[in-house]
Amino acid sequence: MSRSVLQPSQQKLAEKLTILNDRGVGMLTRLYNIKKACGDPKAKPSYLIDKNLESAVKFIVRKFPAVETRNNNQQLAQLQKEKSEILKNLALYYFTFVDVMEFKDHVCDLLNTIDVCQVFFDITVNFDLTKNYLDLTVTYTTLMILLSRIEERKAIIGLYNYAHEMTHGASDREYPRLGQMIVDYENPLKKMMEEFVPHSKSLSDALISLQMVYPRRNLSADQWRNAQLLSLISAPSTMLNPAQSDTMPCEYLSLDAMEKWIIFGFILCHGMLNTEATALNLWKLALQSSSCLSLFRDEVFHIHKAAEDLFVNIRGYNKRINDIRECKEAAVSHAGSMHRERRKFLRSALKELATVLSDQPGLLGPKALFVFMALSFARDEIIWLLRHADNMPKKSADDFIDKHIAELIFYMEELRAHVRKYGPVMQRYYVQYLSGFDAVVLNELVQNLSVCPEDESIIMSSFVNTMTSLSVKQVEDGEVFDFRGMRLDWFRLQAYTSVSKASLSLADHRELGKMMNTIIFHTKMVDSLVEMLVETSDLSIFCFYSRAFEKMFQQCLELPSQSRYSIAFPLLCTHFMSCTHELCPEERHHIGDRSLSLCNMFLDEMAKQARNLITDICTEQCTLSDQLLPKHCAKTISQAVNKKSKKQTGKKGEPEREKPGVESMRKNRLVVTNLDKLHTALSELCFSINYVPNMAVWEHTFTPREYLTSHLEIRFTKSIVGMTMYNQATQEIAKPSELLTSVRAYMTVLQSIENYVQIDITRVFNNVLLQQTQHLDSHGEPTITSLYTNWYLETLLRQVSNGHIAYFPAMKAFVNLPTENELTFNAEEYSDISEMRSLSELLGPYGMKFLSESLMWHISSQVAELKKLVVENVDVLTQMRTSFDKPDQMAALFKRLSSVDSVLKRMTIIGVILSFRSLAQEALRDVLSYHIPFLVSSIEDFKDHIPRETDMKVAMNVYELSSAAGLPCEIDPALVVALSSQKSENISPEEEYKIACLLMVFVAVSLPTLASNVMSQYSPAIEGHCNNIHCLAKAINQIAAALFTIHKGSIEDRLKEFLALASSSLLKIGQETDKTTTRNRESVYLLLDMIVQESPFLTMDLLESCFPYVLLRNAYHAVYKQSVTSSA
C-alpha cells in the first residue's frame, strides 16, 4: 500500500465514522420497520400471503439464491401476471437490503483501513474516535442480526429478482452479491466472528480501554450511597466548585451502550477472553448485569444463550462456557435486586438534585456534569427494567415490577426542565469558563508540546482563538453559538494523532486528550444542551413498549403516593419523535400518531381519575349538607318535646342520634377519615395535572388542565341532572330546595379545586349552569329545566285540573285536597314560596322563561278550544251581548248555550296555570332582587313610567324585559306571543276580534252556574275556593288583556262590557228560589270583587255602578259566618 494511502488526513476516518454511524442507525430503522411489517398480517406485503403465489414463493425460497426461470412455467405462471406490480411494490424492501449490503461494504473497508493505520484507541483519551469505532462495530453487528431475523427476506428478494428477470430478461445486477450475503449471514454472529479475526487487535484495544470506565459505572447502590454520588449538599464547602473529571464524557456515557460494546465486541474477538484477564473480567461483569441486551428498540438479544451456542462449537472453550453459565445464574439471582436498589437510590438522589437546583439554579453551571450523569444513570436503569420486564425470570418477578418507576421518570423530567429553563445561566457560566480558563490551559499545553506539526498546530490554534473570542455579552445579546465545527476538528485531530507513526501521537500526550475532552463538554453546555438531553435522557424506547408503558401508568395511578408523578408519562410522549430518522421518513406519521394517542389517553385517564375523586368528595359533602336539611330536625324536636312533657316509656330510650358536624370533631390526629384519604389522593393527582401548563407533542399542544375542566363540566352536568332523582315511571322528583342544597355543596367542592389546580372553575359553572337553563344541553340531553318544567306541567298542574290539588292564595302555594286516592307527593312541598325561589335559583331567568313559555303553550291550547266553543255558540252569544238588559230573553238564550261547564273548566285551568306562573315570577323577582338589586329596581322604574301614549310595540318590549326579571305586567308579553301564534288563515282579523269579544261574553254569562257547585264555597282561611274558581279572576283579566292587545281593541272597554254582563247575570241569581241553584251564591258574588282587584283596568267605582257594594259586603259577611259555623 502506498504511503499516500496511509496519510490519516486523506483517510477521513472521523468523517467516515460519523457518516456511517448515522447511516447505520437509519438502516436499522428501515430494517426494523420491514421486520415489523412482515410480522403484521395487515401490513405484510400481499404477495407473501397470496394463495395464488404460494407455490411460487415456496419454490423461490427453496432454490434461493439460485434463479431458475426455465422449466418452471407452471409454478411461476402467476408470477408472470403480476411481475410489474411486484417490481413496483417490493422495490422499497429490495433496495433496503441492497443498501444494507452497501453499508456492510463501506464498514468493512473502513475497518480494514483502521487496521492498516494501526489506530490507537483509548476511551479516556481519544473519546470520540473510540466511541464512534465501537458504536460502528455494534451497529454493524446489530444490523446483520436484525437482517437474519426477517424471515421473509429470501421470499422478498427472490420475488423481486424473478419479477425483474421476467421483465428485463436478466437478474438485477446487485442480486448475486445480495443473495450470497443473505446466505452467508444466516448465522450472523458466527460469520462475523470469522470476519473480525483481522480486526481483533483494534477492537480489543478499544474494549480494554473501558477497564477504567465500565467497572466504575457498574457499581452497586450501596457503593454509590457510600460515595455520596450525585449529592450537591454532601460537601457544602465545595458546592460552588466545578464538577471535574479527567474523563468528562465517560461520566455520562450510557452503561447500556458499554455493555453492548463489551458483549458483542468480545464475541467478535473472543480469542482475547483466553489471553487477557482484563478482557475476561469486563466480559464476566457485563454478563452478570443483564439477561438480555437491547438490539434496536424492542428487539432484544439473549446474551447467555447466544454466547453459549456460539462457543459450544469452538474447541477448548469449555471454561468460557462454564463462565457464561455461572454469569447467567448470577444475573438471574442478583441482577434484578441490584438494579432495583440502584433505582431506589437514584430516586432519592435525583429528588435531592432537582430540589437543590430548583432553589439555586445558578448551581447548574458548576454542577452541570452531575445533572447529565444523573440523567444518564436513571435512563440506563429505566431501559434495563423495560427490556427485562418481558423477559424476567419467574423466581424473582418482584424485582422486575417497579411501582415507583414514575417517580424516577418524573425527577428526570424535572432535571430536563431545569436545563431547558436555565440554559442561559449555563451558557453564561461556560462561556466565561471557556474563555477565561480552558483557552489559557490549552494554550499552555500547546506551547509545551515538544513536537507539533503544522496541520495540528493550525487546528489547536483555532481552538484557542475560538475560545478566547467568547464573551458574556454574546449570551446577553441572544447570539446563537455553534461549536460543531470545533468539535469535528477535534475528532479529526484525534484521528490524525492516533494512527501509528503520527508526528504528534495522542498516546504520548494523554493530558492534551483529556483536556480537549473536557473543553468539548464545556462547548456542548453552550450550544448543544438539547442534544445533550437527548443523548443522556431520551426515553423514546417507550414508544415501542406500549403495553408496558400503559401498565406502568395504570400502576402509578392506582398507587396514591405515586399519582403525583403521573404527568411523567404524557411528558415522555414528547420524546418519541427523537427516535425517528431521516432515512425512514415514512414512520414519522406512525410514531407521531402513537405519541399523540398515548399522550391523549394518559391525560384523559388522569383527568378521569381526578374527576372520580372529586365526585366522591362531592357525594360525601352532599350527604353532610343533606343532614342539615330542616326535615332531619323533626326527630330531634320530637325527642325534646317528649323530654319536656316527661313522657315515660316502658322501653329504654333509643340511643341518641349523632348530630351533623360530629365528623369534624377529632380526638386523635392519627384517625384518617375517608374524606381525608380522598383529599390527599386528589391533591397528589392535581399536583401532576398542574405541573405543566402545556406540552408540545409532534406539533400539537396539550393542556392537561383543560382535560380536567372538560371532564368536570361533563360530570357536573350529569350530577346536577342525576341529583333531581327524576323517575319517569313514578313521576317522583327532588324538591328544588333539596336539589339547590346539593348543587351548592357540589359547587363548594369544585371551588376548592382552584386551591389545587389553576383552572377557571367559574367558567365550568357558567358553561354547565347556563346549559341547565336551556331545554337541552350541548349533548342533546335533557336538563333540570326540562325535567322540572315537565314535572310541574304534567304532574302537579295535571293533578290540579283533576281536582286533587287547589291553589291557596293565602299560603301562596298549591295544597293537596283530601281525596280517596292519596297523591304520592305533597304539592305544598314543591310549590310554596321557598321552593319556587329555589327553583328560580336553579333555573335562572332563562329557565324560568322556558317554564313560562311552556305554560303559555298549554294556555294557548286551552284558548284554541274555547274559541271552538265560541264558534259553536256564536249566534246565541251575539244576541246575548246586546240583550243583557232583557232578563227574559237572556234566560231563554242561556238555555240554548252548549258547553257552559267546559268553558268555565277551561278558564279555571288557564287561571290555575297563570296563578302558578305568578308564583314562579314572584319567586324569580325575589331571587333577582337579592342578586342584582340595582338592575331590578332600574327595570321596575322603567316599567312603572311608561307613558300611556307609548306605541304598543315599544311597551311590549319593556313588558318583555320586566317579565324576564319576574315583574308583573298589565299585559303578559309571553301570553301575547303564545296567543298571537294562533291566528287562523281562514278567519279574518275582524272575525277573530269578534270571537275574542264573544269569549268574554260566554264567560260572563256562564258565571252564575258556578253557584250550584258544592265545591264553589269560598273559604276565608285559604282566601279562595276549593275548586280553584278564584283563579278565574286572573284568567279573565290576563286573557282579555292579551287578546285585545293582539286584535288592537280597547282592553278597558271590553272588560267594562264583561263586568256589565257578569254583574247582570249574577244579580239574577238573587231572584232565584231554587236553593240548589243558589247554594253558593255569595261565594260566586265574590268573584266580581276578585276580578276588579286583579285588574289594572277596572275600578271599584265601576263595579259599584254595575253591582251594589252592599251585596258584596253581605256576601263576605255570609261566607265568613258560614266558615265559622263549619269550623265549630
From Swiss-Prot:
The keyword Membrane applies. The chain crosses the membrane at residues 995-1015. GO terms for biological process: apical protein localization; basal protein localization; cell migration involved in gastrulation; embryonic body morphogenesis; embryonic foregut morphogenesis; embryonic heart tube development; endoderm development; establishment or maintenance of actin cytoskeleton polarity. Keywords: Acetylation, Cell membrane, Cell projection, Cytoplasm, Membrane, Transmembrane, Transmembrane helix. The modification N-acetylserine is found at S2. Its main location: membrane. High expression in cerebral cortex, not in cerebellar cortex. One of its GO terms (cellular component) is postsynapse. InterPro entries: Nck-associated_protein-1. Residues 651-665 have a biased composition (Basic and acidic residues). It is found in: Cell membrane; Cell projection, Lamellipodium membrane; Cytoplasm. It is a single-pass membrane protein. Residues 640-665 are annotated as: Disordered. GO terms for molecular function: small GTPase binding. PANTHER family: NCK-ASSOCIATED PROTEIN 1. Associates preferentially with the first SH3 domain of NCK. Component of the WAVE1 complex composed of ABI2, CYFIP1 or CYFIP2, BRK1, NCKAP1 and WASF1/WAVE1. Within the complex, a heterodimer containing NCKAP1 and CYFIP1 interacts with a heterotrimer formed by WAVE1, ABI2 and BRK1. Component of the WAVE2 complex composed of ABI1, CYFIP1/SRA1, NCKAP1/NAP1 and WASF2/WAVE2. CYFIP2 binds to activated RAC1 which causes the complex to dissociate, releasing activated WASF1. The complex can also be activated by NCK1. Interacts with NYAP1, NYAP2 and MYO16. Interacts with TMEM132D. Part of the WAVE complex that regulates lamellipodia formation. The WAVE complex regulates actin filament reorganization via its interaction with the Arp2/3 complex. Actin remodeling activity is regulated by RAC1. As component of the WAVE1 complex, required for BDNF-NTRK2 endocytic trafficking and signaling from early endosomes. Belongs to the HEM-1/HEM-2 family. This is Nck-associated protein 1.
